A protein has these predicted regions:
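Metalloprotease/metallohydrolase-associated module, dominated by Zn2+-dependent proteases
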Residues: 122-197
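Non-catalytic architectural context of zinc metalloproteases
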Residues: 1-13
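Auxiliary, metal-adjacent structural segments of Zn-dependent hydrolase domains
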Residues: 12-70
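Solvent-exposed, polar/charged alpha-helical surfaces in well-ordered, non-transmembrane soluble domains
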Residues: 12, 16-20, 92, 96, ...
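Structural recognition of the beta-strand scaffold that forms the well-ordered cores
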Residues: 44-47, 70-74, 166-173
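Catalytic Zn2+-binding segment of zinc metalloproteases
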Residues: 97-115
Length: 198
């Protein structure tokens, strides 16, 4: 990881963006309403200047050692609210982490969900590290991608655990359009074969 303090100049831009694309979204009258977030927000939001990369080279959406009562925002120093990719990466992380938090407040049937892909989850990113070798931009780890799609998942993060898988479903519905999600589901109809494209 490249964890160091964020540049103060970017903190306000990040906060304004997450207010508009997270808080305002969930409190919109047609969704949760103005009281929806009461008692549901993370207790703390931590910001870091650099990326959150694990020992295998994969950039992560969250802090593996933290509780869901805390939200961790990375790459603040590179954030630019005019850059669609930077906003996309930030909001994928925010929506993923908040979905995990909501999963603890509104329990889902984990056993039933686990039965869908029980033997397909991976314990470590080591087996997919080859995909991220030389990756410098980060976005690749956060997108809908053929490799996980063909294994029955939306993203690389979905492969890591049932909780991440469930959170990814929510995060993706908030950051992608229906057409993109349908294309991923269509790719999932063709199982992955070693040696095929990523």
């Amino acid at each position: 990881s490249y964890i160091y303090p964020p540049e103060v100049a970017n903190v306000k831009s990040v906060l304004n963006t997450i207010k508009t694309l997270w808080i305002d979204l969930y409190t919109a009258p047609e969704l949760g309403g103005d009281k929806f977030l009461l008692g549901k927000n993370p207790l703390k939001i931590y910001m870091y200047g650099g990326r959150n990369v694990d020992g295998n080279g994969m950039e992560l959406l969250d802090n593996l050692e933290a509780t869901t009562n805390e939200m961790f925002l990375y790459n603040v120093n590179e954030f630019n609210p005019q850059d669609e990719d930077k906003v996309f990466i930030l909001m994928r992380s925010v929506h993923h982490q908040f979905a995990r938090h909501l999963m603890e407040l509104f329990p889902y049937d984990r056993s039933k969900f686990l039965s869908i892909s029980r033997n397909k989850y991976i314990k470590s990113t080591k087996s997919i590290a080859w995909i991220f070798k030389g990756e410098t931009q980060g976005r690749r780890g956060f997108i809908l991608a053929g490799y996980p799609n063909k294994k029955g998942f939306f993203t690389f993060h979905s492969l890591l655990s049932p909780e991440k898988d469930f959170a990814e479903i929510i995060s993706l519905k908030l950051t992608y359009g229906p057409k993109d999600l349908l294309q991923a589901l269509d790719r999932a109809k063709t199982p992955y074969n070693a040696g095929s494209d990523k």
